[in-house]
Amino acid sequence: MDSIDTELAARIRRDIIFGTIKNSERVSEAQLCESYNVSRTPVRLALRLLEREGLVKRGEGRGYHVQSPSIQDIKQAVLVLGHLESLAARLMAQQPKQNESISILKNQIDEIDHLLSTLTFDDASLQLIQQHNAVFHKTIMENCGNNFVNFTCNQISHLPMLEVGLMVFDKSVLSTEEGVERSIFRLKLGNSQHKVICEAIEKGDSVRSEGMMREHLNILVEYIELFEKSDEKLTLSNLITYSGIELSTFEPTKKEASN
């Protein structure tokens, strides 16, 4: 169970991302205590965490100024994530034989293949694919032999589309037969890349594993750019609806949304 300050930081972070707390808005400990009905200690600790994440900046006196990330910030962070995951794949390929970890990777590939063969594109199926995809990517991250790679990824994982192993869907196209076929093709292509990455790691081919992982993750930037072209007023909250993130992680409560 998360501590009170961690839970509070998540609530404030969500409100910043959804714009309930506006960019450049000044917030104080007293104000947040009242808004979230908590004492000063968890507020102070939550603000320190959010400051490290770059979502708030300490101003003059005791106040903070909100620094809501932009779409460009997300694109830049996705590029960083791509380099880190590519590095993790290369480093894992250089590690001594990891039969158990390789077995986990292969199991995720097989499970995704099975789901794609019977896919109906309902929420339950997509969620299962998302889970197996996350296990695949996190297994590489956690077994690369360099804890700082995983640590650095965790520092940006609070942002939309920045969770390791997150999948991206344009749900607007899933209402058409052509859109479903195109999405299935993309998922099959992604899992075929998983197979190449896994085989390269198993063979100790660090160059191949790194290159394929980078190609595999380039799709995230391409999708953000595609969403920007289709929506000139693209916001972070819009971006979340395109990702595999469970909206309950970010979505304001009904009471908050009505304010």
For each predicted feature, which ranges?
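A generic short alpha-helical patch detector that favors 3-5-residue windows
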Residues: 4, 76, 80, 97-104, ...
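Short, solvent-exposed amphipathic helices
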Residues: 80-83, 132, 223-226
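Short linear motifs at protein or domain termini
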Residues: 1-95, 229-232, 243-259
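Conserved amphipathic alpha-helical segments that form helical-bundle/coiled-coil interaction surfaces
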Residues: 99-171, 190-200, 206-220
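Residue-level marker of regulatory loop/turn positions in helix-turn-helix DNA-binding domains and
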Residues: 1, 25, 66, 129, ...
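Short, flexible helix-adjacent loops and helix caps
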Residues: 17-21, 89, 93-97, 117-121, ...
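A ubiquitous short alpha-helical element
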Residues: 71-75, 93-98, 120-124, 176-185
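C-terminal all-alpha effector/ligand-binding and dimerization domain
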Residues: 166-259
